[in-house]
Amino acid sequence: MSQLKLEEISSVIEEKIKNFELDCDMAEVGKVVSYADGVAKIYGLNGVMSYEVLEFETGDKGVAANLEEDSVGVIVFGFGNNIKEGTSVKRTKSLMKVPVGDAVVGRVLNALGEPIDGKGEIETNEFSLIEQKAPGIMDRKSVHEPLQTGIKAIDALVPIGRGQRELIIGDKQTGKTTVAIDAIINQKGQNVICIYVAIGQKESTVAQVVRKLEEYGAMEYSVVINASASDSAAMQYLAPYAGVAMGEYFRDHARHALIVYDDLSKHAVAYREISWILRRPPGREAFPGDVFYIHSRLLERAAKLCDEKGAGSLTALPIVETQAGDVSAYIPTNIISITDGQIFLETDLFYSGIRPAINVGLSVSRVGGAAQIKATKQVSGTLRLDLAQYRELQAFTQFASDLDEASKKQLERGQRMVEVLKQAPYSPLPIEKQVVIIYAGAKGFLDSVSVKKVVDFEEQLHPFLEAKYPQVLEEIHTKKVLDKDLEAMLRKVLEEFKLTYSE
């Protein structure tokens, strides 16, 4: 046996040292001290960041919500059924991110951005933090482009602009979700990506919404995020932030997005539940002191960006449920003060057959007027006042039987205008058709039509226009203003239709 030379031995040792890799993974690890109701108290993670994602040895994940001197309060995603005292937890040193971009469009996701529609994984390399700073004043531009909902009462009286936050508020079962879904359906062909965030809804309700969006071809440009009533409070709390992160991607890439939060009352309740378990002091209505801040930091991320930033926009339609019409409760008043206006839906109107049940007296759009097209402004300029006077007159007629001719005429026209503003669900109307029917009502073309037949008159008018005078609709659509020639033509068309219309 030949002996190894000294030089060979040293070269072999040298080679071994060069190729030696120390496979060592450094991790900060803590232990679960207690776990209850989706919140874990952890000892031993001193360097953890606020809202950092933590990993449990059971495979569960959570975020650090409470940073105390000797422990960390962690909100666990899901129910964490296998977590118990003594379970190891390690840091990931990253904040929570969700997938963004065109890869998520057309999908149904949970609050963590994971697909729940059975269509396979989301293939994307683009992720965004769920907590981002809202754009500053200098990065914004005033709202000036319309975002049409296709609902006559909204587009005429409480117009919404791209980059606006418009609250939809009302009692249970007054058609709040329907208004939001109509707005999403109406964005077809408008290059607007829509995000619907369901918070604490029944699974069956969300399935119905997805079915409706698919039926009207709206899922092609929509994302649905679902944190249902059966999900944990943590998932319900995180869902809107995941949704807005996805919307911000389009806003920041010079595109337009619309986000619906359905609804923020349940979001506040989920946050209240988490805060109680984290032993944070309760305030008014037992909500924690920072409940205003969780909604303001969410809604401030909706904005119209300036030209230097690409002029993209993110429009928000938060929904809030009231109890017995009480808009002075804590959460409704908070969100009213954060948003740029509200659409108020009333139970009494809903049950009296006025649908959408929008109370035009209490509904307001603080910045949308600048975004409304001129043609709509021209036909609906006095509509709010006319409807207010009609309501006053209607209340007066309950006590007085004798009315002069002018009052009778005003009352009759008011009744017809109320009928004009009625609309079936899931049937948004293009703005040019809205202009035509509101013009017909405001200028007295419906005065000779019986109140019960106004809806029928409208249903027959639109096909007549499309068949015989499509150029009128086309001109309103392109010009966006009723000039003298166009108005004269519109009058002629309406007079001709009245001759052919039979009740």
Swiss-Prot record:
Q: What is this protein called?
A: ATP synthase subunit alpha
- Keyword Cell inner membrane belongs to the record: yes
UniProt keyword annotations, A-Z: ATP synthesis, ATP-binding, Cell inner membrane, Cell membrane, CF(1), Hydrogen ion transport, Ion transport, Membrane, Nucleotide-binding, Translocase, Transport
Q: Does the keyword Nucleotide-binding apply?
A: yes
- Topology versus the membrane, per the UniProt entry? Peripheral membrane protein
- Cellular component GO terms, alphabetically? plasma membrane; proton-transporting ATP synthase complex
Q: Which organism is it from?
A: Helicobacter pylori (strain J99 / ATCC 700824)
Sorted alphabetically, which InterPro entries does this protein's record hold?
Answer: ATP_synth_asu-like_sf, ATP_synth_asu_C, ATP_synth_asu_C_sf, ATP_synth_F1_a_nt-bd_dom, ATP_synth_F1_asu, ATPase_a/bsu_AS, ATPase_F1/V1/A1_a/bsu_N, ATPase_F1/V1/A1_a/bsu_N_sf
The protein's matches in Pfam families, at most eight in alphabetical order, are given as: ATP-synt_ab, ATP-synt_ab_C, ATP-synt_ab_N
Name the family the entry cites: Belongs to the ATPase alpha/beta chains family.
Which principal EC class is assigned to this enzyme? translocase
The protein's job, in short, is: Produces ATP from ADP in the presence of a proton gradient across the membrane. The alpha chain is a regulatory subunit.
Which sites bind ATP? G170, D171, K172, Q173, T174, G175, K176, T177
Record text on subunit structure and interactions: F-type ATPases have 2 components, CF(1) - the catalytic core - and CF(0) - the membrane proton channel. CF(1) has five subunits: alpha(3), beta(3), gamma(1), delta(1), epsilon(1). CF(0) has three main subunits: a(1), b(2) and c(9-12). The alpha and beta chains form an alternating ring which encloses part of the gamma chain. CF(1) is attached to CF(0) by a central stalk formed by the gamma and epsilon chains, while a peripheral stalk is formed by the delta and b chains.
Catalysed reactions, as listed in the record? ATP + H2O + 4 H(+)(in) = ADP + phosphate + 5 H(+)(out)
Record EC number: 7.1.2.2
Please indicate which residues carry the site annotation Required for activity: S363
GO terms for MF: ADP binding; ATP binding; proton-transporting ATP synthase activity, rotational mechanism
Report the subcellular localization.
Cell inner membrane
